[in-house]
Regions:
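Noncatalytic, solvent-exposed loop/strand surfaces
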Residues: 1-143
Length: 143
């Protein structure tokens, strides 16, 4: 069932806890960290996507997909790519000052079947595996 989760940052040299984030719910996905901005993106099964500072654990924003999420978020080229069980594919800006209540996603579409795999971008093409197909979406055209 759905339970409480805990995201913990450990010092790689000492193994000591640097910070922890207790708002995350049950998750089976991995986090994505953008090396340029230091932003960490995590998601949970209840459909929330969290943007944190990877060094401090400070929360910048939380986005609600309103559907269960099995896949991990993916970050590339200043964007966050997420898919959910309702088949929604969403691309969000990878920036600390994004405001989910007032700012729109960069791109949003429904694939008509659940997305259980992690979206991946390569050479300007977004690849999305659904329950039934593998799609290649030209990122600039959104096709």
């Amino acid at each position: 069932g759905e339970g409480l989760g805990n995201l913990v940052c450990l010092d790689a040299d000492t193994g000591k806890k640097v910070w922890d984030y207790r708002k995350i719910q049950r998750t089976i996905s991995t986090c994505a960290i953008d090396p340029e901005s230091g932003l960490l993106i995590a998601s949970d099964y209840t459909g929330y996507v969290y943007c944190l500072d990877s060094k401090t654990g400070k929360e910048h924003w939380v986005y609600d997909t309103k559907a269960h999420m099995w896949s991990s978020p993916f970050v590339a080229d200043g964007k966050v790519y997420i898919g959910d069980e309702d088949g929604d594919l969403v691309v969000l800006p990878l920036k600390a000052d994004f405001d989910p209540k007032n700012d729109d996603p960069i791109f949003e579409t429904n694939m008509l079947v659940p997305i259980y795999s992690t979206p991946v971008v390569a050479h300007g093409t977004l690849y999305v595996g659904t329950q039934t197909h593998l799609y290649a979406i030209e990122e600039k055209a959104g096709k």
